[in-house]
Amino acid sequence: MEASSRVTVQVLLLALVVQVTLSQHWSYGWLPGGKRSVGELEATIRMMGTGGVVSLPEEASAQTQERLRPYNVIKDDSSPFDRKKRFPNK
């Protein structure tokens, strides 16, 4: 009985491997073989045809500089491994 169940499991595993290797994955906009249709590619390029330049509002630069300031400025004389500050009970 052990041999027949082992053969059954092997046949099922082989069938699963064959099914997975022979199946075709179809994505939206892709043709078999991983090739994209030229019409869709052309439409995508037209949508992205902004000249590669993204304009930012002038007010955003002041807000960005405020956001990029560090919250905590570390003093040069303090050590990050100062045990007395980190572990006051020891």
Swiss-Prot record:
One Gene Ontology term of the molecular function aspect: gonadotropin hormone-releasing hormone activity
TM regions (residue ranges): none
Residues bearing the modification Pyrrolidone carboxylic acid: 24
Subcellular location: Secreted
Keyword vocabulary terms for this entry: Amidation, Cleavage on pair of basic residues, Hormone, Pyrrolidone carboxylic acid, Secreted, Signal
InterPro entries: GnRH, Gonadoliberin
Signal peptide: 1-23
GO-annotated cellular components: extracellular space
Keyword Disulfide bond: no
Predominant localisation class: secreted
Residues that bear Glycine amide: 33
Recorded superkingdom: Eukaryota
Family to which the UniProt record says this protein belongs: Belongs to the GnRH family.
Function, as annotated: Stimulates the secretion of gonadotropins.
Record-given protein name: Progonadoliberin-3
